[in-house]
Structures are given as C-alpha cells and as structure tokens.
C-alpha cells in the first residue's frame, strides 16, 4: 500500500469534493474546518480533490527531474499542508519518502541524507535560511523549495489548476505504472537514536498495508465527523498515525508545535476527534493552569506512545479529557501498533483499581505475533521477564543498506526489540525497560522504569530519569535525575530517596538525586539517557 493510496482510496470511497474557496470563506475560524487538509499556521485549506491535483502536478515535476520508482526523496520541513503535498507526490511516482525532523541537528539530518542516498530534497525556506551550507552539501539543482502556501515558487492555486511550468496538465493515469509491489519500499524512518546513531528502517508496501489493517480494526472511524490534529512532528509517529484517518475521510488539522493553550483551544474549536502526543507533551497540557476550562467532548482517541507514561498523570488525563486514552507499543523496526491498550482497558483499570493495567502497553494487536524470549531465544512463560520479540507483516523490511544490523536482531523468524518485558496471565504486556538501560548494582539487576514510575507520581515532580553511575563499591549506583514542576521550589533529595526506599526497598532506591532544570530530550520528546550518562561515564561502551 502506497501512502497516496490512503488519499486516493478515501476520495473514491467517500467522494470528498469540498471546495477550498467555500471553506476559506465560510469555515475559517469556525468549529468545522471542512473535509480536507487545513494548515492553521499558514491559513490555507486543500480539499481532498485539490490535494490529489497538487500531488499529481508535483509528481510530474519530480519525473522531470529524473526521479524513478524507488529513488529516495526527503522532506525537510515543519508541519504543514505543503509537506503533505510533497509526501503524496513522492508516493504517487513510486519513490521512497524520507522524513527529516526539523528539530534534529543539521549534522544528524545530513547523515540520514547520505545513508539513504537521497536524490531530491523538498526543503522549507526557513531551513535553507538557517543552514545555507545544506544547499552546498546537497546541490541546488536537486532541491525543491517550499514555504507556506508555495512549492517551487508556485502557489497552491496554480498547482491545483495544473499550471506547473514546462509540465502542463497531467492526469492521474500518467502515474499508474508507479511501483505497487508489496515488497517495494514506501518510506524510511529513522530509529530513535536514544541508544546511539540513528539507523533507517525500511517500511514496505506490505508494512503500510498491515499498519492500516491494524489501526482500522483497533480505532474505527468515530460516530461523528472526524478531525485529526497533527501537532507533534509529522516526521515521526504523529504524521504516520494520520494516514488511516485520511483513509477514513477525516479532516487533517495541521499546526507546528505543541503550545498547551493553543492545542487545547484547537481541540475545542475544531471538534478534534483524534490526536497523537508523546507523554512529555501530555504532561505539558496537564500542567497548564487552565486545562480544565475547555470542551473535550469531541475526542474519541487520545493516542499516546513513544515512551512510558506516569500512571498518576494518566489517571489525571482520563479525568480531564474523558474516557478516550489509548496506547500502542511499537518502534521504527516494528511500527506503530504491536500492542494496544484500549479505552475499555483504561476504564477497567480504574473500575477494578488495577494500576498494573495502566502500567502496561496493552494486549497483542491483531496481525502481530509477540513472544518473550530468553538470551538463548527460548520462549518464556507468562509472568517471566525477557526480551520482547515480534513476528508479522508489520515488521520493517530491514535496516537501509545495513544487512548486518538487520541480521543481528533477527533469529528463527523473530525480531528482537531490545526491550525487556513481561506478559501477565491476562495477556497485558508490561515494558520493564530497555535492555541496555538495566542497572547492575551490587550484583542485582535493577530496571530504572520501576523507579521512574514511582517518582513520577510525586506531586512536585515534572519528569525524571534514572540511570546507573560508576561506583567503586556497588559497580553502578542508582541515581535519579529530576525535573521539578516549579524550578524555584526547594529540592528534597532525602524525601525522594526515603519514599523510594519505603516503596521499593534499599537496593532499588536511588542513592542520590540530582535536580536539573531540564532533561535532554530527542526531537520527538524521548529523554536521552545516553546524554545524561556522558556526564558520569568515561567508558564509551556504557554511553548508550
């Protein structure tokens, strides 16, 4: 399944034909933005049909530049409708989409460009102005500039009317020969990079078809007109999660950035039904003083993933936003939805006073096989900890141009995730921790996530990370790095240590607590423990 198939199939099924002019005139500022793609930062709307037209014209531009099926084309732009235009054009010609996160460093994105062998770059003018050396590195001839309502210097209105210079009017039939083989690569996604330099996971047509099948089964179209809000980076899960709502005929509301007051206002004003946010962004919403003043009755799926979430903050989110929270577990190598914690699961946890359900990431998703393996590859029974491994058509094809790294995580048909987990008797999977994050102190194995979950529940704590630091006596000393909600408040190191001792015992309790103004985070909001470890460790093998 190509990405453009989500758009084309939706149009064919639902006949979304709303006109931009009518929506621009009648819908702007009102609660219903209409059916299509609405860019709130650039004040522009494209109906589904207009998006098809624009993508056809841009695909023709790419063809003129010599782009062939399976060539790699990157988008380096903030969230925008223009970025969606580029994505669908890339897909329509059968090329491979590589999204680059604007919050990455330039060096990190240049490494991804070089790893992938990018042939054409869609580049936002704001990025070009910030990094003029990028053009010298990549070449102006193979760069297409976009900004706001313009791509390649042309307004959307011109593209809709098929007035691309030297291309002329192009119809959909011109692109029926683009690659649709189930094993053809559709997109490349950078791995988290939280434990080292990012690799590129290849998602095939079959991967995307499976993502679609799973997501439609787990999160069917709502009972009211759908609006999906994209505010977290399109280059990662928030963007990837938007394609099934597109297939279901949802309006896509696009903003760049996660300012709490603005997001909450958009949810109310535009009657948002779906959104995806990482836990760190949800914490910001919950901390906003006026969070309870807005109307969230339109929400059907408030999707969170990408990192563990505090149980206490999750309970608060359910209280404020309603019974709409859903969670998935996945990674770039096994994308989006290996497991699913449904709305009903969240409610069951509250009704039965069973916080272990909220600490889990749900049950195994349809079309996915999942097992807990020991170090020798043997499957472990329920309630025993081991490494999570997965099978199924959801998996990536492999790491781009890195067969050795692909082979290293695959064994007897299973793909190892690098995550330690345990499956309970009811089928709920709990992520214990990253295998590499485990602390060995005094001969005991300690998983930081258990300690972090406890500290997160303390009223004064905004966020925390627990790591092992070198210690002559214990080998590694359990250390908590803490962000306070109020940076001006008086830190209580001994209070945190004693609280953890009372709940977890002396082995797992931190031996020291350090208070930082801000934890280092990746562009998608994950705490970068490798950066924290650099402060304490000199051994390069442990800085992962």
Tell what function each PLM region has:
Residues 5-47:
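AMP-dependent adenylate-forming
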Residues 247, 273-276, 286-355, 369:
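Gly/Ser/Thr-rich phosphate-binding loop
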Residues 45-49, 186-210:
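Conserved AMP-binding A3 loop
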Residues 161-190, 197, 220-227, 366:
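Conserved pre-ATP/AMP-binding loop-to-beta segment of ANL
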Residues 363-367, 376-408, 446:
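Conserved ATP/PPi-binding loop(s) of AMP-dependent carboxylate-activating enzymes
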Residues 44, 59-104, 445, 483-484:
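Conserved AMP-binding/adenylate-forming
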Residues 209-227, 235-274, 288:
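Conserved AMP-binding/adenylation subdomain of ANL enzymes
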Residues 104, 121, 267, 275, ...:
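AMP-binding/adenylate-forming catalytic core of the ANL superfamily
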């Amino acid at each position: 399944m190509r990405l453009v198939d989500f758009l084309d199939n939706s149009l064919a099924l639902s006949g979304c034909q709303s006109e931009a002019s009518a929506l621009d005139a009648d819908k702007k500022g009102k609660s219903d933005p209409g059916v299509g793609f609405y860019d709130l930062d650039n004040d522009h709307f494209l109906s589904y049909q207009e998006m098809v037209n624009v993508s056809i014209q841009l695909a023709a531009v790419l063809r003129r530049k010599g782009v062939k099926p399976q060539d790699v084309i990157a988008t380096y732009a903030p969230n925008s409708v223009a970025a969606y235009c580029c994505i669908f054009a890339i897909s329509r010609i059968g090329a491979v989409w590589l999204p680059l996160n604007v919050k990455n460093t330039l060096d990190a994105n240049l490494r991804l460009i070089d790893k992938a062998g990018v042939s054409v770059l869609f580049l936002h003018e704001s990025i070009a102005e910030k990094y003029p050396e990028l053009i010298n590195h990549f070449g102006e001839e193979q760069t297409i500039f976009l900004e706001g309502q313009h791509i390649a210097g042309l307004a959307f209105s011109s593209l809709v009317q098929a007035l691309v210079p030297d291309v002329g009017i192009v119809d959909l039939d011109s692109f029926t020969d683009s690659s649709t083989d189930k094993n053809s690569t559709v997109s490349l996604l950078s791995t988290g990079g939280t434990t080292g330099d990012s690799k590129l996971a290849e998602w095939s047509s079959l991967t995307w078809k499976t993502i679609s099948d799973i997501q439609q089964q787990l999160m069917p179209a709502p009972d009211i007109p759908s609006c999906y809000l994209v505010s977290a980076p399109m280059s990662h899960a928030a963007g990837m999660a938007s394609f099934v709502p597109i297939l279901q005929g949802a309006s896509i509301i696009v903003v760049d950035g996660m300012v709490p007051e603005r997001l909450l206002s958009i949810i109310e004003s535009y009657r948002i039904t779906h959104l995806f946010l990482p836990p760190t962004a949800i914490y910001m919403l919950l901390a906003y003083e006026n969070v309870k003043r807005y109307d969230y009755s339109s929400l059907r799926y408030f999707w969170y993933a990408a990192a563990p979430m505090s149980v206490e903050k999750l309970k608060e989110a359910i209280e404020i936003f309603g019974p709409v929270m859903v969670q998935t577990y996945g990674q770039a190598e096994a994308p989006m939805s290996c497991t699913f914690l449904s709305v009903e699961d969240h409610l069951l946890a509250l009704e039965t006073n069973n916080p272990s359900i909220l600490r889990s990431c749900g049950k195994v998703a349809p079309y996915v096989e999942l097992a807990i393996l020991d170090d020798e590859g043997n499957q472990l029974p329920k309630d025993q900890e081991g490494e999570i491994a997965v099978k199924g058509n959801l998996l990536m094809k492999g790491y781009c141009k890195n067969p050795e790294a692909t082979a290293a995580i695959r064994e007897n048909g299973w793909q190892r995730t690098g995550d330690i987990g345990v499956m309970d008797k009811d089928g709920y999977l709990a992520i214990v921790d990253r295998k590499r994050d485990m602390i060995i102190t005094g001969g005991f194995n300690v998983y930081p996530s258990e300690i972090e979950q406890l500290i997160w529940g303390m009223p004064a704590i905004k966020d925390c990370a627990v790591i092992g630091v070198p210690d002559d006596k214990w080998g590694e000393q359990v250390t908590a790095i803490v962000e306070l909600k109020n940076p001006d408040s008086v830190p209580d190191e001994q209070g945190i240590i004693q609280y953890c001792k009372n709940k977890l015992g002396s082995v797992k309790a931190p031996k020291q607590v350090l208070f930082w103004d801000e934890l280092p985070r990746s562009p998608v909001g994950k705490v970068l423990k490798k950066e924290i470890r650099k402060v304490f460790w000199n051994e390069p093998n442990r800085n992962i």
